[in-house]
Amino acid sequence: MVRQLILVLSLILFCGSSHAVVSELARQSESAIQGLADIKMAPLRYLDVLFGGNPGGLRGLDGGNSASLSTLQAAKVANILARGDIASSGYSKISAGVGKGSDLITIIKNTRSYDPYLIPPGIPGYNYPLGWPLRYPLGPYWPNRPPWLPINSPPIRPGGLFPGGPSPGGPSPGEPSPGEPSPGGPSPGGPSPGGPSPGGPSPGGPSPGGPSPGGPFPGGSPPSPGGPLGPWQFPWILGGPRPNRPGRPFPGGILPGHLDGSVVPNSVLNVAGGIFGNGGLFGTGIFGQHGLFGTGFLSGPSLDPFGIFTPIGNFFGSLGNLFGFSSPSQIIPIFGGKFGPLGRGLQGSITLDVGGTVPSVKGILGQLLHPFLGFLG
């Protein structure tokens, strides 16, 4: 760094050529931007270890150790990158939007279209799933729709999905809602006055005449703490944190609208899909997820229903974010919406908290060119 600054000073003092000075400044700036781009993209590339080449979720959900090992590797790299606080302003989180059936260039590979409510659940590697609903034609929001239990899923941690108590926004899937009778047990207020129902078993037994309302659960009773953990219980896989949006109804309860309760859009680096990226052209919001200036016209999914131009959109979105253009964080849910010919395209978001601050391009250039161009910082 000192040698580079000495070279710039030498050009200013002895060359007397403004063209040479500008050329050298441009070369130094290009080098700084390229180095910063490598720093920022490294954690996202390590997400490929977590999300690459698997149908619709994290590796290791079958009880293996690959997910935990990959998480440790990603955390290790993030901590290494976060140690050097070069500038005060920067990014504390790096978020990668998963476009429908897309490859985020070399960051997240082999995104699969996957809907467990369809039979068949989709063709891996394609932009949209094929299949038809089973029993319930109105999609996953149809009341009392029985979820399909995954095979060899790990058990729920004691205390629910969130340590220290139930999930925010409602009960965990598989648990009874407040005011409803528990599966296989009496009502919250105790048994009905007068004892058990005539001609039927006592409270706590099966309902007379067959299974209780809501339909049977494949494989037996509904999931309970210590039982199978369904994919709908991972809101950060399905849709990621959704800022300022209420919870959405899912089978057995309500998923929280946000995982940790806070998102700071200014400190999140977004990499999104679409022909211009979900954040719009160069991350400015123009022609973004919600169309031309938010009107819905020329929106990303309508321009690119099959994800063909998603890598181009990722490039423009990354380039815009690199220079400080950033739109508010916008997360697209997996299920529903107007994405794809069947409306069931796989989209979402993954966020990596680097545990520190990765310096921004503006801060790097301000430190590099100060005091010559200190106004950049």
Curated annotation (Swiss-Prot):
Q: Where is this region: Disordered?
A: 155-253
* UniProt organism field: Drosophila melanogaster
Any one Gene Ontology BP term: mating plug formation
Please provide, in alphabetical order, the Gene Ontology terms of the cellular component aspect for this entry: extracellular region; extracellular space
From the UniProt annotation, give the residues forming the signal peptide: 1-20
What gene name does this entry carry? Ebp
Q: In which tissues is it expressed?
A: Specifically expressed in the ejaculatory bulb and seminal fluid. Detected in mated females 3 minutes after the start of mating, and for at least 3 hours after the start of mating.
- Compositional bias annotation for Pro residues: 165-228
Q: What does this protein do?
A: Major protein component of the posterior mating plug. Accessory gland proteins constitute, or are required for formation of the anterior mating plug. Posterior mating plug forms before sperm transfer and the anterior mating plug is formed after the start of mating.
Supply the alphabetized keyword list: Behavior, Secreted, Signal
Q: How is this protein named in the record?
A: Ejaculatory bulb-specific protein 1
The compartments listed are: Secreted
